[in-house]
Amino acid sequence: MPANPNTNFTTGATLSSNQMNRFPRGVMNSAVSSTSYTLTTTETIATGMSLSFTAEANRLYRISYYEPQAQTASVASNTQLTIRRNNATGTVLQNSVFTNETNALDQSGMYLTVLTTFSAGSVTIVGTAKVSLTTGTPQLIRDSTRFANLLVEDLGPN
């Protein structure tokens, strides 16, 4: 998926709309949540991690999902975060697994990112989460200084 860079500019040249449309457009939408979320073995949309934006064909988008603190079950288990299209069972765009190999609770921040294109139109992106076991209290820990983010950025033409 190579980027389609802009042209070189020269002094005195006229900046055209075609050239302007080749620049990145930046943040298309974002979702932020400071509410903790208790994990289950069923993949569901994590609290607050859903957004929509209007995509244009042939443009490159970066989607990022960040959880400041994922707390595992208190036994050996996996915590999974996924970026999906449409809903909790939609097309997987990116996925990450945090494995706790010990019989003790473990914690870690998690970050996923993906570069992709879409057809023109409305696009819904969700961040989902699940765990393999629920022994203890596996959760996504958030508060006013540790908040989850789901972000879509337009990087320019593809």
Which role fits each region the language model picked out?
Residues M1-M28, T47-S52:
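Extracellular "spike/adhesin" assembly and maturation modules
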Residues V27-T35:
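Disulfide-bonded cysteine-rich modules in secreted/extracellular proteins
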Residues S34-L39, T54-A55, L60-N158:
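Terminal beta-strand-rich extracellular "head" domains
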Residues L39-T47:
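Short, polar loop/linker segments at the starts of domains and inter-domain junctions
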